[in-house]
Amino acid sequence: MIGRTAGSIIAVALFAAAAGPVGHEDTTLAVRLPSGESRLFWRASRAPVQWTAADVRLIGLVTWHPGQPGVEWATLPIAGHGEAHALTLVLARLDPRAMSFDLAWAIEGDRPAWTIDRAGDAALALNAGMFVERLPWGWVVMNGRERLPPGHGPLSSALVGLADGRLVWVDGDDVSTWRGRAEGDVRFAFQSYPTLLAGDGEVPAALRDGSINEAHRDARLALGLDRQGRLLVAMTRLDSPIPGADRVPFGLTVPEMAAVMGAFGAQHAMLLDGGISAQLAISDSVGHAKEWKGLRKVPLALVARAGH
C-alpha cells in the first residue's frame, strides 16, 4: 500500500509531467505578491553576466526573521516557467563571526545516514556537497584532517573553514594552497559543483553558452558568500497544499539558481546536492526548528551553531 504522503507526491509528479517540458523560450523569474500580481526580477534574454550587488527591489520584498544569534531566515513565493510556476524560496543569512561550523559525516553500514532529524540544537543544518553513489564528491576535511582527496572539474568550488572562524571561498578546483595547511589553519572544507557565481559575482560562461543543460529543472539547494562575508543559503520548494508535495524535485534551472544567488547579494555561489537530497533545518529565535525535509539520507552535512 502506498502511504498518503507518498501517494500525494506521486500525484503531483504525474500532474507536472503531464504539463510537458518547457522549451527554450525567454524564461523569467518573478516574486508572487499578496495581491495576486507578480514582480519580475530576472529574464533569460537580459540575464546579467555579472552580479555586482544585490537587487535592492527584490531584497525589499523579503521579510527576514531572527533565528539563533547570527542567523536570519525568510521565505519568498516566486514563479518561474512550467513546473516552476509556483515555488517557495527558503533563504538564510549567517554571520560567521557569531557562528561555529562543523561537518557531520554519516555513513552507517556502508550507507548514507544523515537527515535533518539529526540536527539537534543546530542553528542551521543542511546537506553539504554533491554526492556520488554513497560518498561526497571531492575534497572533505573534518577537524583539520583530510577525509577525502580533492575532486577535479572546471565548475567546482570549495568552502574552507579556518581555525580562527573565518570562511574562505575557493573558485575552481585548485585547492592546493589550502590543502597543504589542512592540519593547521583549516578546520573543515568541502567541494561541490556546479559553480553558480565566481570572482566578483561573475556567472560562469558554461551557464550562459549551452555547455550545461540550461533547461533541466530540479529542486535546488545553493550555498554562497556575500561581500560582507555572510554565508547565504537558498532552497527551492514546490508550493503545494498537498502534504509532502513540497519535496517533489521540481524547481529551477541552474542559470535561474545563479540569478537567485546573485540577486540576493552573493559574490560566490555553488549548488549543493538538490533533488530528493535537499534538506534544511533552521532554529528560530526561541529554539523551535523550521524543517524542510528531503526524501533520502545523505553522507555529509554542514552544521552551524551559535557562538564559537
Where is each model-derived feature located?
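Bacterial Sec-dependent signal peptides at the C-terminal "C-region" and cleavage site
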Residues: 3, 10-27
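Zymogen propeptides
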Residues: 19-158, 166-169
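Extracytoplasmic
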Residues: 87-89, 119-121, 191, 218-220, ...
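Conserved hydrophobic/aromatic beta-strand scaffold that supports enzyme active sites
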Residues: 89-93, 195, 222, 301
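Short, solvent-exposed aromatic-acidic interface loops
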Residues: 105-111, 174-177, 235-241
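A short, polar/proline- and glycine-enriched secondary-structure boundary/capping micro-motif
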Residues: 111-115, 178-183, 242-251
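Active-site-adjacent helix-turn-beta-strand microarchitecture at beta-sheet edges
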Residues: 127-215
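Conserved, well-ordered active-site substructure
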Residues: 135-154, 161, 208-272, 276-308
